[in-house]
Amino acid sequence: SAAETMPGVVAVLTRKDLSDIDPYYGHAIQDRPIVALEKVRFIGEPVAAVAAETASQAEAAMLQIQVDYEELSVAASLEAALAVDAPILHGGELRPGAAHGLGDLPDRAGNVCYSYSINRGDVDLARESADIVIDREYTFPAIYQYSMETHSVIAQHDGEEIRLWASCQHPFLVRAEMAKLFDLPIERVRITVPFLGGGFGGKSYTKMEPLATALARKAERPVKIVNRVDESMVTTRRHNMNCRMRTMATSKGELLG
């Protein structure tokens, strides 16, 4: 492509470079490809990556990459995704990730990933004994934790070993996922976490490490990725949430349920 012939460009990574590995990862559900394969599912999902001698050369090469998109049906809210006629966002079988702790994944026809319930105590008795019952619905938007230090990683892949220097809060989980992704024994993956700075959960689990490693593998030399703040905002966020909560209490302030 035109990007590959730009000054300073060492490698351009696209989906065709991932055909020899299983490119999906995810700490709970393996639903994130290293780069988009057949579909782009959200704003900010990587479709390609460029390694160059300088950041400005890499950015210039990225502008030369042409992508033809076919517009598909969109579910841009929880309500739209749960509708009977909603487009299926993730097809195929759900696969648990390295930190999956939700029990067995159910067969599903729609966009619901998992249903979970827990009961403790006598809820009906608590409601009958309560002097006040408050039943409300709450909406929480997606948030970005906004640490001053953005996401960054240096990756080296020589074919036999992966070496990472990454701002990650879960290095052992990242190591396990990287070993699976690139089909290496776990002892062949080494991760060093320098001074992390702020994280607040936003640097939890695997984020940029697969992309940097795949690019380093193709470039056959170490690769560094340092996000800008706006790039970090689409790298990781806490999901938005709709929540219904019913609280039961006595007139003396004792919480019953």
Show which residues each predicted segment covers.
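Flexible, low-hydrophobicity surface segments
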Residues: S1-R108, L125, V133-R136
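Alpha-helical support elements that line or immediately flank enzyme active sites
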Residues: S1-R15, A49-Y69, S152-A219
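General beta-strand structural signal in soluble alpha/beta enzymes
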Residues: A11-K16, F42, I134-Y138, L164-A166, ...
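Short, glycine-/Ser/Thr-/acidic-enriched flexible segments
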Residues: D17-S19, V47, A55-Q57, L94-R95, ...
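Short helix/loop capping segments that flank catalytic or ligand/cofactor-binding pockets
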Residues: D22-P23, A58-A61, A142-Y144, L173-R175, ...
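Glycine-rich and small/hydrophobic secondary-structure elements
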Residues: A28-A58, F200-A249
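Short beta-strand elements
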Residues: E38, S152-H157, M178, N242-S251, ...
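Conserved beta-alpha junction segments in alpha/beta enzyme cores
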Residues: G121-F182, M241
